[in-house]
A protein has these predicted regions:
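Membrane-embedded alpha-helical bundles of polytopic integral membrane proteins
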Residues: 1-233
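Active-site catalytic microenvironments for nucleophilic, acid-base chemistry
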Residues: 199, 203, 252, 287
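Hydrophobic, small-residue-rich transmembrane alpha-helices and their short perimembrane loops
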Residues: 238-239
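Interfacial loop-to-transmembrane junctions
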Residues: 251-275
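C-terminal-most transmembrane helix of multi-pass membrane proteins
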Residues: 278-279
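Juxtamembrane boundary at the C-terminal end of a transmembrane helix
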Residues: 284-292
Length: 292
């Protein structure tokens, strides 16, 4: 009972933080979201680094954190000053930092190639992946608000629907070797939840509230509704894949949670594992719509 109470309180606090960040971003200033995502990237990198260190050579964390910070600076300068692709600029920083890492490892007596591989892994997951979430904030209106809201609606809806449908119907396991509690019925429920979230946001975009917070059409005519629903579906798939990938890492290194930072909920990565993959899918989908 005490654990349930702790989980509810922490869950409520997380919800309030998410809503506050979204509203401050959409109604006040874009920097709130940038700072939030950078904090997730740094916190997530520390957790993943600590996790894989339990079984594999320890990543060079200072280089990972430097990649996150310098990559963010390059991203913002590219988007706001030079007016070129932020994602491209970020990955240029990643490439430079990888070269610096190789030189550093070659000159070190304590580190070897395995440390370099571990470091590069954390550079990509979760740091580079979360830069796509950062990318939402620098999309043109109304894609910016739509993308942010889709991510923070679809992923939670997927998790909630998957939990309740899976707990109720049970049935055959989805990936018992990776996550014994996940069922096929739960996965289907999650897909329904993500699709419902996309549909609800479509209807919200048609209201005065949606207009007030910066939402709008993703495309013209009937295809607008279809795109909201399709993003909900594919982002739900990505959310569940991200969840399984995080579970795979935790099982490989023999841990239950990435940390105990969030009482009853584990660590940062335990809360955003699905979002890490979903943000990539949503960003690419919306980028294609913008290019059309």
């Amino acid at each position: 009972m005490k654990d349930i109470k702790k989980r509810i309180i922490t869950g409520g606090a997380i919800f309030v933080v998410f809503v506050a960040v979204i509203l401050l971003t959409l109604l006040v200033h874009w920097t709130f979201f940038d700072v939030f995502v950078l904090a997730l990237a740094v916190g997530g990198a520390i957790e993943v680094s600590n996790a894989i260190s339990k079984r594999f050579p320890r990543p060079v964390l200072p280089i990972v954190l430097a990649t996150a910070v310098l990559g963010y600076v390059a991203y913002v300068l590219a988007q706001k000053v030079v007016k070129i692709g932020g994602i491209t600029s970020f990955f240029c920083v990643v490439l430079v930092m990888c070269l610096a890492l190789i030189v550093y490892v070659m000159c070190s007596k304590k580190l070897n190639t395995n440390n370099a591989v571990s470091t590069m892994f954390v550079m990509i997951y979760p740091v580079a992946a979360l830069m796509y979430m950062l990318g939402f904030n620098h999309l043109p209106d109304p894609y910016r608000a739509n993308a942010i809201l889709l991510l923070f609606a679809v992923s939670p809806f997927t998790d909630v629907f998957a939990f309740f449908v899976g707990s109720t119907l049970k049935g055959k396991k989805l990936c018992p070797k990776i996550s014994p509690n996940k069922t096929i019925s739960g996965a289907i429920g999650g897909l329904i939840g993500g699709t419902v979230a996309g549909a609800l946001l479509y209807f919200l975009s048609l209201t005065s509230v949606g207009e007030f917070i910066g939402m709008g059409a993703l495309s013209a005519g009937v295809s607008n509704c279809i795109n909201f629903i399709c993003i909900g579906f594919v982002a739900s798939v990505a959310t569940q894949v991200g969840d399984l990938f995080a579970s795979f890492i935790k099982r490989a290194v023999g841990i239950k949670d990435y940390s105990n930072l969030l009482p009853g909920h584990g660590g940062i990565m335990d809360r955003i594992d699905g979002m890490v993959f979903a943000c990539i899918v949503i960003y690419l989908y919306v980028a294609i719509l913008i290019a059309l």
